[in-house]
Structure formats: structure tokens, C-alpha cells
Amino acid sequence: MGKVYAVGVGPGSPKYVTEIVKEIVQNCDVLIGYKYTLKTIEDLIEGKEIYEITMNDQEKSYQKILPELGDRTLVIPFTGDVNFSESEVVDRLIEIFGEVEIVPGISSIQVAASRAKVPLDKSKVITMHVTTPIEDKKLELQKALIDGFSVVLVPRPWPKQPDKHFMPSEIAIYLRENGFDTTKMKVHVFEAITTENETNFEGTVKELEGKEFSDLSVMVFNQASLDSYMNYRWQWEN
């Protein structure tokens, strides 16, 4: 069988596609991906065999190409980084194709943290964007906030099943109902980050209640304070 790659193409802007991923995409024969993801790399895939998929029909495309791949190279592009919020799909690709080379990309998590000036080494990163139950992740969110960490979070859009829908408004209500004073909690919500349609809400968690955001949203709870090396003079002073 030919080579199979799972690659991250960044949050949405072609400027955030890494050079190694560009090279892999340009040299491949077949691509299987979502419309939004393929749009990010559209200038690199002209003339390729392309399968545009949805969550409902992706399995059909993987199974179709499996016996037809031969010695050709297949690329499955992912928005952001392959290693974040995509493990269920990557696991399935490994089950189907066996050897899959994973190439990371720049995540919306990284960009959102940078936009909000929140260092990841003082933050907890949580994704609710999974199909498995998220009750433990909700508790993880509470604990991180109580412990004083900033939190960079990917919410879960599931409008067809309200009990699973956990977007910024639902998260704000959840935190308030669990004893947090959301009127004093600072938060950013970025939508379509790095693209021409990027938006940034900045305010309190309380203000999120009743607001609608797209499925391309990332939240940043900002509890960071400046703590430079000048607070640790012992490193160079005798």
C-alpha cells in the first residue's frame, strides 16, 4: 500500500500551513477531507483526486479508496493540529490503513492563546469537541479555574442534540450554576480565527449567556498575571 498521511493544515488561513505540510500535500495523489479544511489548501490541490466528506459519509470514502490506493499517496488533512480533538478519526484511520504518518499543524488553541496573551505554560487546555461523554471534562474545567489557571477551551457544537450542545452560552450557565461568580471572570471567544471572518468577543463569562457562536469557536478564560524573570533574580544574583 502507498503512503498515508494525516496532516494538520492550521486554523483556516493558508498562511498558517507549515512548509512540511505544503510539501506533503503538493506531492500526494489523493485527498480526503472536509470542505472547510480543503478550502484552506485549495491552492495546493489542483489536479488531485479529491473526496469531500462529512461526518456522516467519511467512512464510505475511506473504504472506497482503501482497495484503490495502490502505491499512491493519500493525505487526510485536518483543520488545526491532528493531535487535538481528532483522536477518534485518527484511530479509525489507523484501523483502516494500518500505518499512518501523523504530521502536526498549528492549532487554533495556540493562536487563541497568543491573541489573548495567555501563556500556555500557565494554562489548562481542554477540548469538549468529542463524541464521548464530557462530564469529567466539565469537572476538569471547574478545577482548573478554581486552581487559578487560565483555560483555553474548544466547546462542543451539537445543536441537533441539546443535551450534548455545550457552547459558550451553555458553559457560562454551567459555571454560574456551579457557584462561580461569572460577572468577574474574563473571557475571550474567537471565531474563525486567522481567517478574514475572524471575530473576537472580549468580556465577562456572564455576558456569554444567550449569545450564539459558530462551531469554529475557541474560548480563553484569562486568569494570567504578569510574572517575568525579574521576579526571580536569584537566578543570576549571588
Question: Which positions does each model-derived feature cover?
Answer:
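Class I SAM-dependent methyltransferase SAM-binding "motif I" and its flanking Rossmann-like core
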Residues: 13, 80, 84-149, 202, ...
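Generic hydrophobic alpha-helical segments
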Residues: 61-65, 140-141, 171
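Generic domain-boundary/flexible-linker signal
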Residues: 42, 61, 85, 134-136, ...
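Class I S-adenosyl-L-methionine
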Residues: 1-103, 110-111, 208, 217-218
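A short acidic, often aromatic-flanked loop/helix-cap motif at beta-alpha or helix-coil junctions
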Residues: 56-62, 108-109, 131-134, 194-198, ...
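Structural motif
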Residues: 33-36, 54-56, 79-81, 129, ...
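A contiguous loop/helix-start segment that scaffolds small-molecule binding in enzyme catalytic cores
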Residues: 2-6, 145-238
